[in-house]
Structure formats: structure tokens, C-alpha cells
Amino acid sequence: MSQTAVVIAIDAGTTGIRSRAVFADGSPSVSAYQEFTQYFPKPGWVEHDANEIWQAVHSTLSTVIAQVNSPIAAIGITNQRETVLAWDKLTGKPHGNAIVWQDRRTADRCGELASELPLVRAKTGLVLDPYFSGSKMEWLLKHGNVPDTAQLALGTIDSWIIWNLTQGAAFVTDASNASRTMLFDITAMKWSPELCSLFGVPMRALPTVVASSGRAGVTAASAGIPAGIPISGIAGDQQAALFGQACFETGSSKNTYGTGSFVLMNVGTTCPQPTEGMLTTVAWDLGTGETTYALEGAIFVTGSAIQWLRDGINIIDHASQIGPLAESVPNSGGV
């Protein structure tokens, strides 16, 4: 390939990792994809092996880099949101599996905290639900054999990937991901001491919140990945989709069908009051001093149901079989 600037995107989804190189001259992109395992240890529980996620990132990224003979200007990362893990900053080893956004193990705990809903809603734009990261972090600290030491790191998947890409030099997240934790004040744009105290999460264990656009770190050299590539973009997957669909004007919106289904609407740079049935979230922070917000409606399970049919109850061997299977009956029998 001729020498033309390249940007590589890492899409760290719920079921797999895709790395893709995009060329400034419009040449065909180069990509690699790798699935990782879904673990269902108990009803309502969903976990990922954080090391397997990192291995998939490393494998797909190095595969793409090997096919690129042009300068790599930057790496951008978009990721499944709310999924959280704990790891040791000294060794880099995870404390058990990551708890996935779909996991419902903290439902009872969220019910116990119902009286705190006004505080959570006002600070975060979210509702008290096990979907979000705060109660998952609390569970890890109480039940996950996670030592609360100075070396503790608690983060979402973007933080884990960047930590590994930089070999521990950068422990960061962006505001779009932070806004999904139930611990981040989306008006003050910082971690909330009140909410961290509510969930028993030590603020020193949380990543530094940086702009969605801007240098968050640089890669360290590892097999197939050269040193010094800037990591210049971070966004939660649905916010990245809103940006990628060019929803830059107030009122513009997108709907994404994937593991779940998510409708987001750009509502401008003033944080709106909570709306019944909707979530308020940070869309992006481009480092300009203004934050763009979004309203969100979510259905948690759509595409992931197909993977469950394949891997959970084994009634299909391939996702492509679901269409003919659905067409083989006249209706769902009232289900």
C-alpha cells in the first residue's frame, strides 16, 4: 500500500473485538475480528474473562498493523459500556472475571437503595439499576475477593484496554464511559464523592477522566504493536455510534441494533432535567470546555438472544440458522 495516514479503531463489543484500519486516501479498510467467551455462572449472571478480552484486542490489532505499511496516526477505542472489572496496578492481573452490563446480580441491592434514587437521578441522569457499574463495583469489593489496597484499579473495558496498551502508563476513561457508572456527576463532570461513598467505592481506585477526543496515552511496544502510537479517542459504543452517524445537531438521533438496541438523541450542551422512562447521559466531551449530552432509551437483549440460543441452549449451530427457524412456525404461540 502507498504511504498514507492511517487511523485504527478498536471496537470492543460484548461478544467480540474488531480492529479496523481506515486510510486517509480512501483505500479499502483492513480489519480483524475475534469472539470471546460468555460466562453464565448463575441465572442472571454474565461474566467475561478480562485476559481473554485483552488477548483478542492484541491479536486483532497486531493482525491489522501487520497489513498496514503506512504511518499510524492514532488509535481510537469504543467499547461495551458499564461492564466493570478490578485489577492490580502492580501486577496487571485481574481480580476474577469482569461483570458484564447485562448482569443482574445486584438487583436486590439496588432495591435496598431505592430511597437514594433522587440523588442518583440528579447527579448521574441514570436510574438505580444493576445495569450500571456502581453496584457491580460494590459487589466486587464485598464478594469478589478484591483487596482494597493502594494498587486496586476499578474500571470499565476502555480503561482495561488502555492500561494494557500502555503497559500501565495510563489509567484513564472518558466522560461518556464514566457517565455510565452511577458514580459520575454529569453536571460537575467529575467523580461524585457522595455516590462513591454510597457504593463504598474508593475514589483512588477509579481512573482519571479525560476528554473523548485527545491524547490519552501512547502504546508501549509488544509483539506486533509498535511503541508510540497515540491513543486519541475513547467513547462508549452507543455514544460513538451517535457521533459516527453525524448526529451533531440538537435533536438528531440514531438507533443501533446489536447485542441490545439503543436509541440516543443529541440534546445539546445543557444537561436536561431527568425525563421519565429515559436516561440522561454524556454523549461526548471533545475537550473544548463544553459537554454534549444525550437522552437514551435502551432494550438490553436483542442480538445477544441469538448467541444465547447458540451457546446457552444449543438449539442452533450458527447465527444464520435463526431466520429459517423463526420462519418455520406461524407465530410465537403467545410468548
In which residue ranges do the predicted regions lie?
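Residue-level signal for inorganic ion chemistry
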Residues: 26, 49, 75, 103, ...
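A generic structural motif
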Residues: 35-37, 101, 285
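Short beta-strand-loop/turn "lid" adjacent to the catalytic site in phosphate-handling enzymes
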Residues: 62-101, 127-131, 138, 162-185, ...
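Short linear loop/turn motifs
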Residues: 206-215, 321-328
